Each structure stands twice: as structure tokens, then as C-alpha cells.
Amino acid sequence: FIEKRKEILRGGTADWATGEALAFGTLLLEGTPVRLSGQDSGRGTFSQRHLEYFDYNTAQVHTPMMHLDPRQARFEVLDSCLSEYGVMGFEFGYSLGDPLTLTLWEAQFGDFVNGAQIMIDQFIVSCEAKWGQPSGLVLLLPHGYEGQGPEHSSARPERFLQLCAEDNIQVCNVTTP
């Protein structure tokens, strides 16, 4: 795996996971803390991320992003329980309490965001209008992964576009040209 990543970088191209790792590393070295949570965030649902390595001999988890530089910002990657509503609510609160941290919540599959829809409707898209309190929570919603079925593959981006009003959220579909 590590050799494959090195080969990608030598070739001048990067897949999504490599670009994401480079972005996280850059933010950490510049002093911005990063917190990522979701059901399978360390490894990545599609085995693409590999932010954590498990040593089967010692039963220890190693997170290389935590060891880039002694002066770097804090990095947390958390594999959460299967309670989208509860975990997204916690991460929303975390983003309010620590607005200088890049706080990300990732749905394991696109349709898993359904379980947190109340949190999105009542808090995330309306917190600034209701309480004058902006949130920097980033939702990572896998979308368009064919082969998982029509529901499992859809994060329902149209639903988020309908929630956009007065600059309350940004909906981005990050892809390659």
C-alpha cells in the first residue's frame, strides 16, 4: 500500500485518498487541528484512506498523521458507533465549541445520512439564522458509488440543495475533470 502511494506521488497524480491525506497533513503542519469521525473513517469504507494501521503482533494502532512534526496541530480520526443522529449531533456541538478545528463527519454510505436528517434540518442548516452561531462542520457524503444499489449509493444531494438559503451551507461535488 505505501509503495503504491509513493508511486502515485512520483507520477504526479493523486487519487482522492492521497489528496485528502496531503490536505490533512498540510493543515496540521500549518497549525489547524483536524477531527474526522464516522463509522469507518480510519480505514475508509472502501479501503481507500488508511489513516490508521493496526499491528496484529502488538495490537497497537498507529496513526502516522499524529507524528508529522512535534509542533503540528492535533489530529483525531475516530471510528464512531452506528448512530448517525447521535454522532452528527456530537460533532455539530464540537464544531461550535472548537471553531478553529476542521471538524468532519463522514457517512459510511450515502443513504446513512438519512438517520441524521433531523440534526441537519433543525441545527446545521439553521444555527446561524436561529442563534447567530455559525458551524464549520463538514459533512462527507459518499455519492455515486455504483454497485451498492440505488439507495445506498445516493447522498441525495438534491435534498441539500433545497436546504440552501442565505449562504447557510455550501454544497460541493468534488470530482475530477
Where in the sequence are the language-model features?
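Flexible, glycine-rich loop/tail regions that form catalytic "lids" or insertion modules at the edges
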Residues: F1-P177
